[in-house]
A protein has these predicted regions:
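Alpha/beta-hydrolase fold nucleophile elbow
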Residues: 102-114
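Glycine-rich nucleophile elbow surrounding the catalytic serine of serine-hydrolase chemistry
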Residues: 112-122
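A conserved short beta-strand
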Residues: 131-145
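Short beta-strand/loop motif that positions the catalytic acidic residue
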Residues: 156, 162-164
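Catalytic histidine neighborhood in serine/cysteine hydrolases
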Residues: 182-197
Length: 231
């Protein structure tokens, strides 16, 4: 792989006794990389996440969509909501990126949906943003930040965008509570008329537009930990 090649390949990440399947797409001379964490009952084949990923790719951002659970694990409802396990699996994917010499130097963002957003927020709290192995930005789509710990929400330094559908009222409340706890640069964006899966006309397009803008802003020039950020 060189800087000027378009790369699209399937990958496997070995974690303990499991193999996680992933789809890697790296445009020529990428601005940065975004790792996707899907929600419960979904997978790397999620049409919604793939739509957002395609918009990121069109704007020069590489993407890795990964299955955080094996097929057998995903059949167990309790495992789907095991945020600690999902976070560990997401961390393994970050480590895979950081060990891949072709993409390891690029700024890294996380895009999480539903329970995957909780894992992304948990993981972001463990990395010092701006460092070589840090997380440069986080975007949550219909996320469940209530499943992340309060300590994690207060610890995150990566700029974080929370996107929620205007008709997803219970999740709006959960995101509003998380927003108050967070001390990083942050934004809560409500998409009018959208439900939890953003299936309404134009809703997913708006999500993609917001995600592209957020990642282009922060992957191109990550905020260093000692820089002043909005509270």
């Amino acid at each position: 792989m060189t800087r000027h090649q378009l790369v699209h390949q399937s990958i496997r990440i070995h974690v303990d006794d499991a193999y996680l399947e992933g789809d890697l797409h790296v445009p020529p001379s990428p601005v940065g990389m975004v790792l996707f964490a899907h929600g419960s009952g979904s997978s790397r084949l999620s049409p919604r996440n793939n739509y957002v990923a395609a918009r990121l790719q069109e704007n020069g951002i590489g993407t890795l969509l990964i299955d955080l659970l094996t097929a057998d694990e995903d059949r167990d409802f309790s495992i789907r909501f095991d945020i600690e396990l999902l976070t560990l699996r997401l961390a393994a994917a970050v480590n895979w990126i950081r060990l891949n010499e072709d993409i390891q130097s690029h700024a890294l963002g996380l895009f999480g949906a539903s329970t995957g957003a909780a894992a992304a927020l948990q993981l972001a709290a463990f990395y010092r943003q701006g460092q070589d192995d840090g997380i440069a930005a986080v975007v949550s789509r219909g996320g469940r930040p209530d499943l992340a710990s309060q300590e994690a929400l207060q610890t995150i330094v990566a700029p974080t965008l929370l996107i929620v559908g205007g008709e997803d009222r219970s999740v709006i409340s959960l995101n509003e509570q998380a927003y108050v706890l967070m001390r990083c640069e942050k934004r809560l964006q409500i998409i009018p008329g959208a439900t939890h899966l953003f299936e309404e006309s134009g809703a997913l397009e708006k999500v993609s537009e917001l995600a592209v803008s957020w990642f282009l802003r922060y992957l191109a020039s990550p905020t260093l930990p000692n820089q002043k950020i909005a509270r």
